[in-house]
């Protein structure tokens, strides 16, 4: 059997874009075994109040050092901050540090919540499930 036929049958994720909307990230997470990392570069206290489920807190001032120590440079990374400007700054810092696949999550946590993305945190835990 021709290997090209097999390659065309087995679906694969498209390459990561430099900017993504919340739907793209949600689709990746629903894919099954996503080989990706979500970084929340907001202040840790804000992160603890509520964040995308599974997002790692890495405040902007610690971002490069912590990411370099814990994440492979080839891993797909989705990053979000308090606003799109902070997100873009964080993404550029990561790219400058040698991370190859970094995507800015446009709209951040608000966009994620708007599409019903899963969240966790102190404030999130206080909201009854029926309140959504």
Task: Name each model feature, range by range.
Residues 104-132:
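A generic hydrophobic-segment detector
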């Amino acid at each position: 059997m021709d290997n090209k036929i097999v390659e065309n049958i087995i679906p694969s994720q498209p390459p990561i874009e430099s900017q993504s909307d919340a739907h793209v990230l949600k689709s990746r997470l629903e894919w099954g075994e996503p080989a990706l990392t979500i970084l929340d570069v907001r202040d840790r206290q804000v992160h603890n109040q509520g964040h995308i489920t599974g997002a790692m807190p890495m405040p902007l001032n610690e971002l490069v050092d912590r990411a370099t120590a814990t994440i492979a440079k080839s891993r797909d990374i989705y990053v979000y901050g308090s606003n799109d400007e902070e997100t873009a700054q964080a993404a550029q810092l990561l790219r400058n540090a040698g991370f190859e696949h970094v995507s800015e999550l446009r709209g951040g946590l608000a966009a994620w919540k708007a599409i019903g993305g899963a969240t966790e945190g102190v404030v999130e835990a206080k909201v009854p499930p029926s309140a959504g």
